[in-house]
């Protein structure tokens, strides 16, 4: 019996497999960066970590480590933004709680061995010619801040005040994630959670009184 394979289906399958393999490498890079930092992450080590041939890794990322790191940071930033946006649909308090819980789960579930890959790249001393990962980190922070700002504005906050509050949230969360790793404890995140929620409530109700 002769099986005829439709050319478009075959190409679609190959494209899907390629995208899947590439996506795994990007996710693997994000995981390595959040554990080791950018300077300690090489394309060769990533290939071993992801159990991928070194040649295919360079094929997917001809720009080398800089391209891979940039895409990994974008991937991590988008992942967090997607969760945050979904929960913010229920309101700024719910979004804040989910954002905090997401990072708490990251540090606790990894035994405090992993943090935020966006922060890890943001604090690296990168050559000016290799600044794309840092730019991706800035974009991720900006997107999270904008999502929080828009949600608070939609619930009654004045925009300038909402922007300040959103910046405080992102800065506090990122800093406390680093503290959690250093102290091997989730207490820093728990402490800021207790402080941030009433501040957000005050921000969204201030203009209603």
Regions found by a protein language model. Give the residues of each.
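N-terminal intrinsically disordered/low-complexity leader segments
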Residues: 1-20, 206-209
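Hydrophobic alpha-helical connector segments
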Residues: 83-115, 165-169
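Amphipathic C-terminal alpha-helical segment
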Residues: 106, 124, 170-187, 201-206
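Hydrophobic alpha-helical segments that form the core
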Residues: 119-120, 159-179, 191, 195-199
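Helix-turn-helix
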Residues: 24, 28, 32-71
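Hydrophobic alpha-helical bundle segments that form small-molecule/ligand-binding pockets
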Residues: 128-130, 141-166, 202-209
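Short, basic, alpha-helical segments at the C-terminal edge of helix-turn-helix-like DNA-binding modules
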Residues: 73-79
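Short secondary-structure transition hinges
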Residues: 78, 101-149
């Amino acid at each position: 019996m002769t099986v005829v394979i439709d050319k478009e289906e075959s190409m679609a399958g190959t494209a899907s497999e390629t995208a899947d393999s590439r996506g795994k490498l990007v996710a693997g890079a994000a995981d390595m960066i959040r554990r080791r930092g950018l300077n300690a992450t090489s394309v060769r080590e990533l290939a071993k970590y992801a159990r991928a041939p070194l040649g295919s890794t360079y094929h997917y990322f001809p720009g080398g480590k800089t391209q891979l790191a940039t895409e990994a940071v974008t991937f991590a930033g988008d992942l967090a933004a997607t969760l945050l946006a979904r929960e913010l649909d229920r309101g700024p308090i719910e979004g804040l709680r989910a954002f905090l819980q997401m990072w708490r789960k990251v540090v606790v579930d990894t035994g405090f061995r992993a943090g935020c890959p966006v922060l890890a790249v943001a604090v690296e001393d990168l050559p000016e010619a290799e600044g794309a990962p840092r730019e991706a980190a800035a974009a991720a922070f900006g997107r999270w801040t904008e999502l929080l700002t828009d949600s608070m504005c939609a619930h009654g906050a004045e925009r300038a005040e909402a922007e300040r509050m959103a910046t405080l949230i992102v800065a506090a969360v990122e800093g406390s994630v680093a503290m959690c790793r250093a102290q091997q404890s989730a207490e820093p995140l728990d402490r800021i959670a207790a402080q941030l929620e009433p501040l957000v409530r005050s921000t969204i109700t201030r203009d209603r009184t």
